[in-house]
Amino acid sequence: MTILTFINKLRCELRDNGTLRKDVWDGDNSTLNFPASTFPILENSYTVKVGGVTKTETTDYSLDKDTGLLSFVSAPVSGSDNVEMSYKAVKFRDNDFLEIINDAIDYFMWKFWKEALDTTTFTTVKNQYEYDLSSISNILYVVNAWYKTATGSTTWQAIQGLTNWKYYPQQNKLYVNPPFSSSSLPMKIFYLAGFTKGTATSDTLDIPTKYLLPFKYYIYARFFERLGIERMNEIGAITTHPYFMASPNVLNVAEMYMRKADLAANKICPKLPPMMIKQMSEGINI
């Protein structure tokens, strides 16, 4: 499913489908900016009219969907209630959900991953000790590595059978020592890959359905965390009690869902594949 489909499901579960609003203002032939009464504003949910004529975004106006500020290129003419905007106000915009989904992928990167195999990107280089693996997308860790001992060979030889190799995750480099004595021999890398982050809500959600529950709990936690902060600002603005602590219940809900996210992840996350152990021959690592 697309990320937008997943977001719409989250909206239903979190009761954030949005509230229809309509704001009207008086044009005066000089004012360019008109603030919406409620925000943030859901993407593609708004219509702006001046004197009953629908205006075109970018050409006639711009809208900051986070702050609700409507800005015209040219000031609307004078009139009573002749400027209007119909829109849907939400707690989270689609882009907010997209950002948090990507944060969840980072949060669970060592709990949930994909196994992947690369057989075309790398070849051996004579006397080269390190191989930069940054061209492999979303790589987390190298589990095993092979190469073909001769051009045209159909047999993959495990690299650790003849030489030592080690992967350094922070540098994203594979170190081989001693290096290969020949160049241009195909290499095969078996690695763990993280889920692909979305750059637009139209992208396909890369998280498998069987692993979605802890990700949803994480998103719930972030949702209520922000809601708690909003409640603090709203209630704090109207109270001066020195011992006032705003919205503890909302923040407790956020903490509860974060705990549920961790517990669910620990229950259903896959086991890491076994890592190769160095072979010993006559007391020497090979």
Go through each PLM region and give its residues.
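Extended beta-strand solenoid/passenger and fiber regions
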Residues: 4-72, 76-79, 89-92, 98, ...
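Internal mixed-charge
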Residues: 1-20, 73-75, 79-115, 154-286
